[in-house]
Amino acid sequence: MIVKICGITLPSQAREISEYGADYIGVITYPKSPRYVDVERIKEIKEKLKNSKLVAVVVNPSLEQVLELLNIADFIQFHGDEGLDFVKNFPKDRVIKAIRVKNESDLEKIKTFKNEDITVLVDAFKEGVYGGTGEMIDLNLLKKITDMYDKVIISGGLSESNIKEILNHVKPYGVDASSKLEVSPGVKDLDKVKKFIDIVKNR
């Protein structure tokens, strides 16, 4: 199971978290996010990674911005309102499409990307907020999603204290944690991060 730790802002923490065994390290390129990092900082973070892949999270980006980031990052995670036509401009094996889930009607959006074999990340919907809300998706809905598609990364309120119980109910392709493992936005509690990774990897 893939473990993604998102919202990293400090190169030193990126190195530590990579050594803990995180598969993916996520950086936020959305300027309105409290976890925003610029291109130069992203390059510094990339240099610190051991075996982890770097995921650049974008929100409603331009074509040019994505192409620039693909020269640095291993994956692009589209976390805004990007449609399938835009996402299909890029190699599907380097793309993750985040879908903010409120209720069962959102399953149709997931199917759209499933039909193209594009990895999907599901996050809890919160009006006007793109990720990092700390809110959870209903477990029954989460199970329907992961039963429907085998390339789903789950996120939203995941922590070292609840991940074991959640994974007793759902079997996703991957898990993504951010805000619940922080001291402050962009600064991780490394003890919590290590516990989270260990719990997932030692299942």
UniProtKB/Swiss-Prot annotation:
Enzyme Commission number, as recorded: 5.3.1.24
Stored Pfam families: PRAI
Enzyme class: isomerase
UniProt entry tagged with the keyword Amino-acid biosynthesis: yes
CDD domains named among the record's database cross-references: PRAI (cd00405)
Catalytic activity: N-(5-phospho-beta-D-ribosyl)anthranilate = 1-(2-carboxyphenylamino)-1-deoxy-D-ribulose 5-phosphate
GO biological process: L-tryptophan biosynthetic process
Keyword Amino-acid biosynthesis (UniProt): yes
Pathway: Amino-acid biosynthesis; L-tryptophan biosynthesis; L-tryptophan from chorismate: step 3/5
Keywords: Amino-acid biosynthesis, Aromatic amino acid biosynthesis, Isomerase, Tryptophan biosynthesis
Top-level taxon of origin: Bacteria
GO molecular function: phosphoribosylanthranilate isomerase activity
Family: Belongs to the TrpF family.
Protein name in UniProt: N-(5'-phosphoribosyl)anthranilate isomerase
Organism: Sulfurihydrogenibium sp. (strain YO3AOP1)
